[in-house]
Amino acid sequence: MGVTAVLMLPLLLLGISGLLFIYQEVSRLWSKSVVQNKVVVITDAISGLGKECARVFHTGGARLVLCGKNWERLQSLYDALISVADPSKTFTPKLVLLDLSDISCVQDVAKEVLDCYGCVDILINNASVKVKGPAHKISLELDKKIMDANYFGPIILTKALLPDMISRRTGQIVLVNNIQGKLGIPFRTAYAASKHAALGFFDCLRAEVEEYDVVVSTVSPTFIRSYHVDPGQGNWEASIWKFFFRKLTYGTHPVDVAEEVMRTVRRKKQEVFLANPIPKAAVYIRTLFPELFFAVVACGVKEKLSVPEEG
C-alpha cells in the first residue's frame, strides 16, 4: 500500500498541475473575451501600474484610451505596446494628454476621450499623487493639490463619462485606491484624506448606479511599489515596531495589481483589498479595536522620532 501511494504521488501532482494550467488558460481566454472590443480608458497610463494595465488590456483586445500628463512618455508606451502586439488581434491605442491635478481642463479632456470612440465601456481611475510629512509642515496649497489630483480630478472625469454609461445601461468604473482609504498612517495626512474621500464617493456611487447596470469597483492595495525597489533599511528598522510598519507599507508589484484589476473587471467585483495579512489585520483592528490601533500607531511614531536619521 505504501509503495502504491508513493507511485501515485507524482501522478497526483501532475494532475493538479495540469488542472491549474487549464484553469489559468481558461481564465486568460475569458479575460480576453470580456474586454475584447471594449473601450477602456486608463488614467496615468505612464505610471508603473498604468503601463501594466495598458499591457494587460491591450493584449486582451481592448480599444485603449491612454491618458497621461507627459506626451513623450505616452508615445513611448504606445511604441512599446505596438512593438509586441499582434495587429490582427489588437487595436491601436489612442493617446490623450490629461493632468488630473489641473481640474479646470478635465471636462474638456473628457469630451476628447468620448470623441475617440464615441463611448466608454470601462474607466480605470489610476492617477494618484503622494506626499509625506508632518501635517503642520504641509501647506494648504499642497493639501489642495493632492485633493485635486486624487479626488476632484477623478470624480470630475467620472461624472463627465457616467451619463453615457447610464444611457447605454452598461459600463464599469474602477478606482485604484489605497489602504489609506480605510485607515490613516502617520505623516500622510493629505494623501490619506484624499483616499478616504475618493473611497467614500465611489462607495456611494456604486449604490446609485446599480439600477443602470453600471458596476463600480474599488481595488485597494497597500502601496504599489516600483519595479526594482525594495523597502529601505534604516536605524528605525531595528525597533520593535518595524514588523508592523514594514508590513503595512511594503507594496504590491504593479504586475500583480494590474492582473487583479483585470480580474475585477472580468468578475465585476465591487471591492478588492489587495494586501498581505498584516495590513488586513490592521484594518480589522482599526474597526473593532480602535483604541488599541491608535495606541500602537502612536507608539510607533514616538519610536521613530526617537531614533536619529541615518546619513
Curated annotation (Swiss-Prot):
GO biological process: D-glucose import; intracellular calcium ion homeostasis; regulation of release of sequestered calcium ion into cytosol by sarcoplasmic reticulum
Keywords assigned by UniProt, alphabetized: Membrane, NAD, NADP, Oxidoreductase, Sarcoplasmic reticulum, Signal
EC assignment: 1.1.1.105
Signal peptide boundaries: 1-18
InterPro entries from the UniProt entry: NAD(P)-bd_dom_sf (IPR036291), Sc_DH/Rdtase_CS (IPR020904), SDR_fam (IPR002347), SDR_family_member_7C (IPR052148)
Enzyme class: oxidoreductase
Keyword NADP appears in the UniProt entry: yes
Top-level taxon of origin: Eukaryota
Entry's Gene Ontology cellular component terms: longitudinal sarcoplasmic reticulum; sarcoplasmic reticulum membrane
Catalytic residue list: Y191
Function per UniProt: NADH-dependent oxidoreductase which catalyzes the oxidation of all-trans-retinol to all-trans-retinal. Plays a role in the regulation of cardiac and skeletal muscle metabolic functions. Maintains Ca(2+) intracellular homeostasis by repressing Ca(2+) release from the sarcoplasmic reticulum (SR) in myotubes, possibly through local alternations in NAD/NADH or retinol/retinal. Also plays a role in Ca(2+) homeostasis by controlling Ca(2+) overload in the cytosol and the SR in myotubes.
Protein name: Dehydrogenase/reductase SDR family member 7C
